[in-house]
Amino acid sequence: MSEFSQTVPELVAWARKNDFSISLQVDRLSFLLAVATLNGERLDGEMSEGELVDAFRHVSDAFEQTSETIGVRANNAINDMVRQRLLNRFTSEQAEGNAIYRLTPLGIGITDYYIRQREFSTLRLSMQLSIVAGELKRAADAAEEGGDEFHWHRNVYAPLKYSVAEIFDSIDLTQRLMDEQQQQVKDDIAQLLNKDWRAAISSCELLLSETSGTLRELQDTLEAAGDKLQANLLRIQDATMTHDDLHFVDRLVFDLQSKLDRIISWGQQSIDLWIGYDRHVHKFIRTAIDMDKNRVFAQRLRQSVQTYFDEPWALTYANADRLLDMRDEEMALRDEEVTGELPEDLEYEEFNEIREQLAAIIEEQLAVYKTRQVPLDLGLVVREYLSQYPRARHFDVARIVIDQAVRLGVAQADFTGLPAKWQPINDYGAKVQAHVIDKY
């Protein structure tokens, strides 16, 4: 950034308004550096809480600190990193207690880059992907054309290293900035709901829909260009297979493939996590509305009783006992008086109670593929099963089918290192990425 777009008073007011502060002592800074180093060695760019604790243990040993309180001090350090916006924490309702951590742009800026702030722009992303596609196509054409070492350095390695890789890093940074924006939107929604949730409903809906739309727009743009980018990378990789002296090009292509897979994968995972948060907020609003109805009725009833002598009123009721049973949990005890006994066909059965039975049925049905040595396409099989169940059961049924399928065998395509295509498994946007199982 060659020049500042804001004046000093504006920057000071902005920093004061957002209450920015960073406090990193030497041990905490060392911990952040250790996290960044280990994170750079991972292909998915994500770390679990256990991996963060292991990194903290190395730092603690280096500073000759006691190992008796390592768990408590590591937890405090992780929470402090999250509070200072150096790490982002993501939790999932399906994997309760297992959090995913990613370095924020601020964390990356401290350890590797200079700090940058950018707004998400679909046009900018489309232009970046267009430039990448052009560079990759020219590099692939040059690779298939062949030539001496200077030709490979000038026309293949250089564009991949200094153009494609940098744009991939820029897109990755954009995604991390979107992570930060999601956390800010969550904070804004929490503040709105704490003040006056009735007046905040429309604002919350706007924030939720805007963020969902932005995430979907980002992912759609990436997926639309992802196949073409991977195809050109594969062309370059095929061209280097006959040359033993081009390991540096082959390694760079592999790194670019990993970056592209990580970008697209995290985009879809981020959407799934945001959908869970969206449902949580809507559930909270619905609960608040139900509670508010009861609160308004109780308040009016108290006022009517208090002003009875000034403004007399009469109350007509059909069942005196029903007037006393105003709490939902007490009314639940009287349901049988209203509905009577349900027929056996309508008796509700918890899904967990039939889980083992369903797993056994699916295991028996899938065993036919192994017996006949027929390839098993998970995308088609899961979609066929989900069409037989309501949408609320799709996640549980899909998990059972996949668990049983992977026990039968493996896909030989997994050993090639190439990613499988995403296949839709229902009409609500759910997808699965898996090669065809053909070795039992």
Swiss-Prot record:
GO molecular-function term, one example from the UniProt record: calcium ion binding
Places the protein is found: Cytoplasm, Nucleoid
UniProt key word Cytoplasm: yes
Stretches the record annotates as Leucine-zipper: 208-236
SUPFAM superfamilies (UniProt xref): MukF C-terminal domain-like, Winged helix' DNA-binding domain
One of the GO biological process terms: chromosome segregation
GO annotation, cellular component aspect: cytoplasm; nucleoid
Gene3D superfamilies from the UniProt entry: Chromosome partition protein MukF, middle domain, MukF, C-terminal domain, Winged helix-like DNA-binding domain superfamily/Winged helix DNA-binding domain
Name of one Pfam family that matches: MukF_C
Swiss-Prot/TrEMBL keywords: Calcium, Cell cycle, Cell division, Chromosome partition, Cytoplasm, DNA condensation
Family, similarity comment: Belongs to the MukF family.
UniProt function note: Involved in chromosome condensation, segregation and cell cycle progression. May participate in facilitating chromosome segregation by condensation DNA from both sides of a centrally located replisome during cell division. Not required for mini-F plasmid partitioning. Probably acts via its interaction with MukB and MukE. Overexpression results in anucleate cells. It has a calcium binding activity.
Quaternary structure and partners: Interacts, and probably forms a ternary complex, with MukE and MukB via its C-terminal region. The complex formation is stimulated by calcium or magnesium. It is required for an interaction between MukE and MukB.
HAMAP family membership: MukF
Annotated protein name in UniProt: Chromosome partition protein MukF
Gene this protein is translated from: mukF
